[in-house]
């Protein structure tokens, strides 16, 4: 969500256009109960999952991001659900992944695909019940798979019991759980929101003649982290899920939670700079250190700082072990590579982005390695080549890259098959609220809607949210009903059933890549060194840990390339991984289009 999501919406809109009180009381009662359940005895072992997690386990895992709405439908309503995921756990186990990151499944009116939460201790009805969740978690742990959940606490839904009470009266005990500006003080200080048609992050609320703050949509009022009672509510929610046995949290939009409640002027806010202005507010790290003391230090959880910091140095503050905050960062720099050039980017840009972050994180802290997510286009369409001749080799190359870099790899559902952008041509096919609102704005401003549609075909978030392609059965085996979002028509040839039977498929290459990383720890912990930096087609680097050394050579082009081995490097044997059937060792490597090699070195 957050930075990459904000980036996309800004790009779409700017680049192409000229009973409440009682409910709240019930919530508070539930909070007190969960706090009692999460006492020291329940957390003494520091590991409630039963997996015997060692410290730092999250460095060696491979994370599979699973978008529940699009993975597997179990009841024919066209929406993926928890029972559907449970039915596919053996498939997830077969991949070799160690951790699933699940996008939000909490109670929600679903204004923003679950990132607007109305009940942090319930399951969204579209996805099932808490019993379904318990069965899913048990099934994952039985197969040695850990579960990480999104923690979305920069804001709640406006349908949360806290907000319903807060907006009903200025004297509500939940009033200070949110940010308010009384109308009698005049217009509130300017705050920018891409998600508002007027680009205003303040929404007037008539019942109490006040404005409330929403960095995201008006359906997502910002929570007031200056209030210690609100912070304790969040910590109790975290204990509730940790005591259930989940294995980690991805801290969604957390870089925005700290705000100066006096709202000093922020002159000159624009679409290009407002997210940086909101980052790293006062007391942000005080909150994280408090969270660590109160909750995280009592469990062996994987904690991920989404969008942490405006640069690698700032991000390090979140994950420096000496600071006792979070485990790893998840940056968005790669999202901006070639973002305004449809179908094009420069390899040098990717090298520079990953090199910059690697330099800062080489000896301390830890980072995530990823190229795709629910907020971005499919990686083979964005960074590879989705033409039929090159889809498979380029998808394999991108997998090789993710599994051979320094950091914890994140693989998005469907990328293991080489799923591609769907390239909708009609606005009626889109479900993404950002795309639909953007189209309406272009239309209202009499802009070029045809150009906007072409842009969406490349960059809409719906490209990465199409249903998983299980087989050549109707709707790709995803549902017996009408899918909530159209299935990519290439499912007849790009699907799990076909690829499992093909030893040279993208899917089986993905399995081999994970097995390679698990076998050779130099690919987890080894030092990264870039080679031939100026080469516009080849990305080559070594990974070194003591006497162990590996060479990774990636041809990011649709043409054959020749690459001479640098002086002092000698291949020690057969490739650990190769996305083509043959390899000829020698002083110069002959590389096929989109060929990817991982080679042991002497």
Could you say what each language-model-derived stretch is?
Residues 21-239, 243, 256-311, 321, ...:
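Acidic/aromatic-lined carbohydrate-recognition and catalytic surfaces
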Residues 560-580:
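Beta-strand-rich binding/interaction modules
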Residues 1-8:
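Bacterial N-terminal signal peptides that target proteins for export
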Residues 164-209, 342-360, 444, 449-488:
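Core domains of carbohydrate- and sulfate-ester-processing enzymes
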Residues 58, 268, 276, 286-302, ...:
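Loop/helix patches that line or flank the sugar-binding groove of alpha-linked glycan CAZymes
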Residues 17-19:
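C-terminal motif of bacterial Sec signal peptides marking the signal peptidase cleavage site
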Residues 585-602:
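C-terminal beta-strand-rich structural cap/linker in extracellular carbohydrate-active enzymes
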């Amino acid at each position: 969500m957050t930075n990459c999501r904000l980036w996309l919406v800004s790009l779409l809109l700017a680049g192409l256009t000229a009973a409440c009180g009682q409910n709240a009381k019930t919530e508070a009662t539930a909070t007190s109960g969960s706090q009692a359940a999460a006492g020291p005895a329940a957390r003494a072992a520091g590991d409630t999952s039963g997996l015997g997690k060692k410290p730092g386990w999250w460095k060696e895992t491979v994370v599979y991001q699973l978008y529940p709405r699009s993975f597997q439908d179990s009841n024919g309503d066209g929406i993926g659900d928890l029972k559907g995921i449970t039915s596919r756990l053996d498939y997830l186990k077969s991949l070799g992944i160690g951790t699933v990151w699940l996008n939000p499944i909490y109670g929600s009116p679903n204004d923003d695909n679950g990132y607007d939460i109305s009940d942090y201790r319930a399951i969204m009805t579209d996805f099932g019940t808490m019993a379904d969740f318990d069965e899913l978690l048990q099934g994952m742990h039985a197969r040695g798979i850990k579960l990480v959940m999104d923690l979305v606490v920069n804001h709640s839904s406006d349908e949360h019991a806290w907000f319903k009470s807060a907006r009903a009266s200025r004297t509500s005990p939940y009033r200070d759980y949110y940010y308010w500006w009384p109308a009698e003080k005049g217009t509130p200080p300017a705050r920018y929101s891409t998600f508002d048609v007027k680009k205003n992050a303040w929404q007037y609320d008539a019942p109490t003649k006040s404005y409330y703050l929403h960095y995201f949509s008006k359906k997502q009022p910002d929570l007031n982290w200056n209030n210690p009672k609100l912070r304790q509510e969040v910590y109790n929610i975290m204990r509730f899920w940790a005591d259930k046995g989940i294995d980690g949290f991805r801290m969604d939009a957390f870089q925005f939670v700290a705000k100066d409640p006096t709202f000093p002027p922020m002159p000159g806010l624009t679409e290009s700079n407002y997210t940086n202005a909101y980052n790293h507010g006062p007391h942000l790290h005080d909150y994280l250190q408090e969270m660590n003391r109160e909750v995280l230090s009592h469990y062996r959880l994987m904690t991920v700082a989404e969008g942490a910091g405006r640069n690698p140095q700032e991000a390090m503050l979140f994950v420096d072990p000496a600071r006792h905050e979070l485990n790893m960062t998840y940056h968005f720099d790669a999202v901006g590579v070639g973002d305004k050039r449809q179908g094009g980017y420069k390899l040098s840009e990717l090298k520079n982005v990953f090199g910059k972050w690697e330099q800062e994180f080489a000896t301390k802290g830890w980072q995530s390695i990823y190229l795709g997510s629910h907020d971005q286009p499919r990686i083979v369409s964005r960074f590879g080549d989705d033409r039929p001749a090159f889809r498979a080799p380029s998808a394999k190359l991108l997998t090789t890259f993710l599994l051979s870099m320094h950091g914890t790899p994140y693989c998005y559902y469907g990328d293991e098959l080489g799923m591609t952008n769907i390239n909708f041509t009609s606005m009626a096919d889109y479900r993404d609220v950002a795309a639909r609102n953007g189209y309406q704005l272009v239309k209202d401003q009499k802009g070029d809607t045809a150009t906007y549609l072409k842009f969406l075909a490349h960059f809409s978030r719906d490209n990465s949210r199409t249903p998983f392609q299980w087989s050549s059965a109707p709707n790709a085996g995803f549902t017996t009903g009408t899918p909530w979002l159209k299935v990519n028509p290439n499912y007849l040839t790009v699907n799990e059933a076909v690829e499992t039977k093909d030893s040279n498929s993208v899917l089986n290459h993905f399995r081999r890549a994970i097995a390679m990383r698990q076998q050779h720890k130099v690919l987890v912990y080894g030092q990264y060194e870039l080679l031939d930096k100026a080469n516009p087609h080849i990305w080559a680097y070594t990974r070194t840990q003591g006497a162990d050394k590996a060479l990774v050579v990636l041809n990011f082009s649709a043409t054959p390339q020749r690459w001479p081995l640098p002086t002092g490097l000698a291949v020690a044997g057969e490739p650990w991984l190769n996305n083509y059937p043959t390899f000829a060792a020698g002083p110069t490597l002959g590389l096929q289009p989109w060929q990817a090699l991982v080679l042991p070195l002497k």
